[in-house]
Amino acid sequence: MEKITLAPISRVEGEINLPGSKSLSNRALLLAALAKGTTKVTNLLDSDDIRHMLNALKALGVNYSLSEDKTVCTVEGVGGAFNWKNGLALFLGNAGTAMRPLTAALCLKGSSEAEVVLTGEPRMKERPIKHLVDALRQAGASVQYLENEGYPPVAIRNSGLKGGKVQIDGSISSQFLTALLMAAPLAEGDMEIEIIGELVSKPYIDITLAMMKDFGVKVENRNYQTFVVKGNQSYLSPEKYLVEGDASSASYFLAAGAIKGKVKVTGIGKNSIQGDRLFANVLEAMGAKITWGDDFIQAEQGKLKGVDMDMNHIPDAAMTIATAALFAEGETVIRNIYNWRVKETDRLTAMATELRKVGATVEEGEDFIRIQPLPLTQFQHAEIATYNDHRMAMCFSLIALSDTPVTILDPKCTAKTFPTYFTEFEKLSERT
């Protein structure tokens, strides 16, 4: 297996321009494909998850052209539901941001009835989709499970979404609601979506609503309990759509600056629509010096202390706090993060296991993780397993800010969101 060893870093300093956001890139491509008109999507992320979405759209008859560096995509919208030849199968890797929204969009009524199968890597078949399918069926959709009940692969007929009152469970993943919201304007009738349970990762819903608005569709949001969407609408191309830099990817660089130096990330700023920008507030609460601009966030080293916080609103970036916590004074508790368990891997167990390898004292709860700090000289050199999870690989690069090297197995798994991560991290790293 491939691996990379990072030697101890004495200081990090510099500026990094972030690649486009994964969540925004795949939403933008799907909305552009469903819209009337042609959309030029810029600062698109070039990564595995985006490639899976692009391949699926091509198979569904969507025409697009991609720039040589794959960051500009001009999409010719089909102006409504997709049409395809019966018997199509789409392989979506481990891309939740493609699987969930496409599951909903492919239920929309096509000009002639056809079936499509959505499948992916073995891990995708372990990632739940039941809450979304239950909701789609209430709206009249035809979706069947082909292997395990409640999980992909699924077979979908484009027999239409009728609208009406639909209840959806919001307690596991906000992607289910995002998928339903994005398909709802193209349903045959108005849809009233009621949330069952506590809606997790609310800021990701804000992203969805903001982007739908950019494509000409307004949703009535009643305090995140009920969402009302008029049916029989069309998305309209905004002609150009700029994808913000990935705020989750920013977290590693900001944390590095907070621990040992000064780092400025560009491509997101104080007006970003991504909830993960609020990661910087957590670093600030820990003692880092944070500066906000319209198009940048800068983190500078401060005396870090542990925090005890609910991080349900920033689940992806919260992982970075788990490794940063080792460099703080006092224990850190990250709470209300059950949905770590249904991501690329079970991130709660993975994080606890790998932190212990470097010498940390960790308590793993059902929906929380408690981490004790570690003196710089007491880190142990370990080989970190990454579980084919891009965020595990990136989080553990921070261990090199101690006095000990760290070895990361399968570093190329960062290709899911940030293929050049280790090169960029290296550019900011100074060694004595």
UniProtKB/Swiss-Prot annotation:
Pathway: Metabolic intermediate biosynthesis; chorismate biosynthesis; chorismate from D-erythrose 4-phosphate and phosphoenolpyruvate: step 6/7. It comes from the Bacteria. GO terms for biological process: amino acid biosynthetic process; aromatic amino acid family biosynthetic process; chorismate biosynthetic process. It catalyses: 3-phosphoshikimate + phosphoenolpyruvate = 5-O-(1-carboxyvinyl)-3-phosphoshikimate + phosphate. It is an enzyme of class 2 (transferase). The active site is at D316. Phosphoenolpyruvate binds at K22, G96, R127, Q175, R347, R391, K416. Its main location: cytoplasm. It is found in: Cytoplasm. One of its GO terms (molecular function) is 3-phosphoshikimate 1-carboxyvinyltransferase activity. 3-phosphoshikimate binds at K22, S23, R27, S173, S174, Q175, S201, D316, N339, K343. Monomer. Catalyzes the transfer of the enolpyruvyl moiety of phosphoenolpyruvate (PEP) to the 5-hydroxyl of shikimate-3-phosphate (S3P) to produce enolpyruvyl shikimate-3-phosphate and inorganic phosphate. Belongs to the EPSP synthase family. This is 3-phosphoshikimate 1-carboxyvinyltransferase. It comes from Actinobacillus pleuropneumoniae serotype 5b (strain L20). The gene is aroA.
